[in-house]
């Protein structure tokens, strides 16, 4: 199971929504579960990492997510998610500008100022004022300019990615003010802690959905790969129902 890949699971939850690719369209674009070699040259390595992630999820991550879900009330969990989203604003804003989207950049900036002023980011009054949340990263920016994803990758713990998006993670670090405000060790500690908390929060909201995808798929690896690719394309195109991801 790939914990830190929200787009995969949330896409599956919304796969019946209007606008998402049908199974036939997905097969035409990405191939069926058995047509994997041509678009997944690192499949053997990816499957090994996928199995590692599944084992880690069963042993550690899922139990932590269940505990987090059951221990804290929804308002607390919502505040945690809002705060983490607010921290990611500089990265989102930079990529809004790089993609040439001033309207989305305006929404992002407004969200940051409103939510920071009224609750230090723990609440989300900006959404009620017409500034909904959206997620952007440099991988999406590259994709918006036609850069292909390159080889599909499954990263340890982080889950589905690609050569393009993995490189994008590095660039996004330079957009994050914490990279410059904290020392090297402090920045790494904060980054890891923030990513882990965001992942646990996401996993806690999708426990049953994750279980159902794994149980109902003949080949969970191929299923997750297909879902991730479809959702990633929707994120790049800024379509409705796109899902934030920890990329």
Write out the residue ranges for each language-model feature.
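N-terminal targeting leaders of membrane proteins
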Residues: 2-85, 89-99, 187, 191-247
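Mid-length scaffold segments of soluble, non-membrane domains
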Residues: 81-163
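A short secondary-structure junction signal
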Residues: 165-169
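Extended amphipathic ligand-handling, pore-lining, and cofactor/metal-binding catalytic surfaces
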Residues: 170-174, 178, 182-196
